[in-house]
Amino acid sequence: MAKIVKVIGREIIDSRGNPTVEAEVHLEGGFVGLAAAPSGASTGSREALELRDGDKSRFLGKGVLKAVAAVNNEIAQAIVGKDATNQAEIDQIMIDLDGTENKSNFGANAILAVSLANAKAAAASKGLPLYAYIAELNGSAGVYSMPLPMMNIINGGEHADNNVDIQEFMIQPVGAKTLREALRIGAEVFHNLAKVLKAKGMSTAVGDEGGFAPNLASNADALACIKEAVEKAGYVLGKDVTLAMDCASSEFYNKENGMYEMKGEGKSFTSQEFTHYLEELTKQYPIVSIEDGQDESDWEGFAYQTKVLGDRVQLVGDDLFVTNTKILKEGIEKGIANSILIKFNQIGSLTETLAAIKMAKDAGYTAVISHRSGETEDATIADLAVGTAAGQIKTGSMSRSDRIAKYNQLIRIEEALERAGTPAAFPGLKAVKGQA
């Protein structure tokens, strides 16, 4: 038995200068797990609650001392003495103790930090790397794959202080044979994009996720700049590198008139018009994945978009599904989208996250493992991507150490598996729904 002997919570700082929750779980034998909860900027309305103090005299109300107190008191008292290797039981104890549908009593930030720290401690007690332990929890021990990165190299929307409406313009180095090669391609395109933007007299300041955040006349201009950068780097767009976008449509959807109002471009669209706007972009550029291409509540619009684009474009639900199996199940039954973005702080525990990934895969949906815009040096999502063989990861651009920490962990994992004589496959474009 890997007995829990101590649980510690503390307030630390994330990549945006805001507090977040970090937890330590200590086991008999001296094994320790340490994990921190991430935080989002553009959030779905049905996400599990991130508990903030609201005390304007500290961190502009964004302190997390209440959540930390829950870790140090109620949660610690409930799980000390339990077996850390019973992950589902540990998570369920915290969920039941919280007693709310959206974890608003303790906060998903408190529960998740402990959940992940517990998994890390349990993995250490079994002498396993975290990705291998996650594979065991997932019922797929020894089955790994390295994820195809979706690299956010131009930031807009809520992730940047510019006039670009679409939140993320991403590249996928699909021509790579290994994760390490994919990162090299991504870095070379990123540096060439800096040259392209400088030559146009544009800003090379970066947004929350490490991508550039220039003012551009249109979303098509962002794609044109990326195309130029890919070619300058010596690669072929559509062969070596494909494109992906996160529209974060809920951020520019006007619920009062039902219009998608892209203020940066000075254009407004109905739901169906916006789908056809995106369809035109996919005809001009090799865009193989679109995330949140409709407002989270516009299920009729999503159904139409899936009908129009779903046979050839990966349509990822982020705000749409919020890593929630109840919502995902309904979406699967109604034929909404064909992929889910996985953010474990949207649901608040490792066990529930694994359940969402399994449900998606069983239904033929892909699962894209994702960071949040507010991150720390915690690289757990790298292990999650490999341990569940998810196939794709979204963890930012080629700058900011909070993003690079995840890529570096993936490098370590890929190398470790190769050294062990059990290299993990890198799926490339085959990982993307509709592209196999």
Swiss-Prot record:
<feature type="binding site">
    <location>
        <position position="318"/>
    </location>
    <ligand>
        <name>Mg(2+)</name>
    </ligand>
</feature>
<dbReference type="GO" id="GO:0005576">
    <property type="term" value="C:extracellular region"/>
</dbReference>
<comment type="function">
    <text>Catalyzes the reversible conversion of 2-phosphoglycerate (2-PG) into phosphoenolpyruvate (PEP). It is essential for the degradation of carbohydrates via glycolysis.</text>
</comment>
<protein>
    <recommendedName>
        <fullName>Enolase</fullName>
        <ecNumber>4.2.1.11</ecNumber>
    </recommendedName>
</protein>
<keyword id="KW-0964">Secreted</keyword>
<feature type="binding site">
    <location>
        <position position="167"/>
    </location>
    <ligand>
        <name>(2R)-2-phosphoglycerate</name>
    </ligand>
</feature>
<keyword id="KW-0456">Lyase</keyword>
<dbReference type="Pfam" id="PF03952">
    <property type="entry name" value="Enolase_N"/>
</dbReference>
<comment type="similarity">
    <text>Belongs to the enolase family.</text>
</comment>
<dbReference type="InterPro" id="IPR000941">
    <property type="entry name" value="Enolase"/>
</dbReference>
<feature type="binding site">
    <location>
        <position position="373"/>
    </location>
    <ligand>
        <name>(2R)-2-phosphoglycerate</name>
    </ligand>
</feature>
<dbReference type="InterPro" id="IPR029017">
    <property type="entry name" value="Enolase-like_N"/>
</dbReference>
<feature type="binding site">
    <location>
        <position position="394"/>
    </location>
    <ligand>
        <name>(2R)-2-phosphoglycerate</name>
    </ligand>
</feature>
<keyword id="KW-0963">Cytoplasm</keyword>
<keyword id="KW-0479">Metal-binding</keyword>
<dbReference type="GO" id="GO:0009986">
    <property type="term" value="C:cell surface"/>
</dbReference>
<dbReference type="GO" id="GO:0006096">
    <property type="term" value="P:glycolytic process"/>
</dbReference>
<keyword id="KW-0460">Magnesium</keyword>
<dbReference type="InterPro" id="IPR020809">
    <property type="entry name" value="Enolase_CS"/>
</dbReference>
<feature type="binding site">
    <location>
        <position position="343"/>
    </location>
    <ligand>
        <name>(2R)-2-phosphoglycerate</name>
    </ligand>
</feature>
<feature type="binding site">
    <location>
        <position position="246"/>
    </location>
    <ligand>
        <name>Mg(2+)</name>
    </ligand>
</feature>
<feature type="binding site">
    <location>
        <position position="372"/>
    </location>
    <ligand>
        <name>(2R)-2-phosphoglycerate</name>
    </ligand>
</feature>
<feature type="active site" description="Proton acceptor">
    <location>
        <position position="343"/>
    </location>
</feature>
<dbReference type="Pfam" id="PF00113">
    <property type="entry name" value="Enolase_C"/>
</dbReference>
<dbReference type="GO" id="GO:0000015">
    <property type="term" value="C:phosphopyruvate hydratase complex"/>
</dbReference>
<dbReference type="InterPro" id="IPR020810">
    <property type="entry name" value="Enolase_C"/>
</dbReference>
<dbReference type="InterPro" id="IPR020811">
    <property type="entry name" value="Enolase_N"/>
</dbReference>
<dbReference type="GO" id="GO:0004634">
    <property type="term" value="F:phosphopyruvate hydratase activity"/>
</dbReference>
<feature type="binding site">
    <location>
        <position position="291"/>
    </location>
    <ligand>
        <name>Mg(2+)</name>
    </ligand>
</feature>
<dbReference type="InterPro" id="IPR036849">
    <property type="entry name" value="Enolase-like_C_sf"/>
</dbReference>
<dbReference type="GO" id="GO:0000287">
    <property type="term" value="F:magnesium ion binding"/>
</dbReference>
<comment type="pathway">
    <text>Carbohydrate degradation; glycolysis; pyruvate from D-glyceraldehyde 3-phosphate: step 4/5.</text>
</comment>
<comment type="subunit">
    <text>Component of the RNA degradosome, a multiprotein complex involved in RNA processing and mRNA degradation.</text>
</comment>
<keyword id="KW-0324">Glycolysis</keyword>
<feature type="active site" description="Proton donor">
    <location>
        <position position="209"/>
    </location>
</feature>
